[in-house]
């Protein structure tokens, strides 16, 4: 396995799929890895390019792999999809990720730090709460209208 140059990693809830190729693009391995064994697997792999599809957990795994010395690139799923050659499954997805990362015009997603992720989480959570509050106010206003009570717009009137 010393000649591996690129690994496409399809991450999932419990079992990940890794697809490794050499410099010439020849398949060296395709294996399933339990979530608990992923870091252990990459300790035994020489430093290489690891490609991930942007999804839940991708930033976490990217940061972990960068700490181990690997070069990591994250791609949007829409850019990976055209490279799936056969029926959609974890092995085909890992192979497609591995293929897509080699394209010269591929666009990548920047790896966010934990601080950047936490900041984005706060803003997304606030937006969600504001939307939910608006939905509740509108529902109450609608129910009130059914009984003949009409309230002006705005949260202070409901």
For each of these PLM feature ranges, what is it?
Residues 1-158:
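A detector of single, family-specific signature residues
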């Amino acid at each position: 396995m010393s000649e591996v140059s690129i690994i496409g990693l399809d991450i999932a809830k419990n079992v990940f799929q890794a697809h490794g190729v050499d410099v010439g693009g020849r398949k060296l391995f395709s294996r399933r890895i339990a979530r608990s064994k992923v870091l252990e697997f990459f300790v035994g792999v020489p430093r290489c390019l690891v490609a991930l599809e942007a999804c839940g957990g991708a930033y976490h795994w990217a940061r972990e792999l960068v700490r181990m010395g690997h070069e990591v690139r994250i791609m949007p799923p829409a850019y990976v999809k055209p490279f799936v050659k056969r029926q959609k499954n974890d092995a085909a997805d890992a192979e497609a990720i591995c293929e897509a990362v080699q394209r010269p015009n591929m666009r990548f997603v920047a790896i966010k730090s934990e601080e950047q992720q936490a900041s984005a989480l706060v803003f997304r959570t606030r937006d969600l709460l504001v939307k939910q509050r608006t939905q509740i106010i509108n529902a109450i206003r609608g129910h009130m209208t059914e009984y003949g009570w009409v309230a002006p717009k705005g949260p202070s009137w409901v």
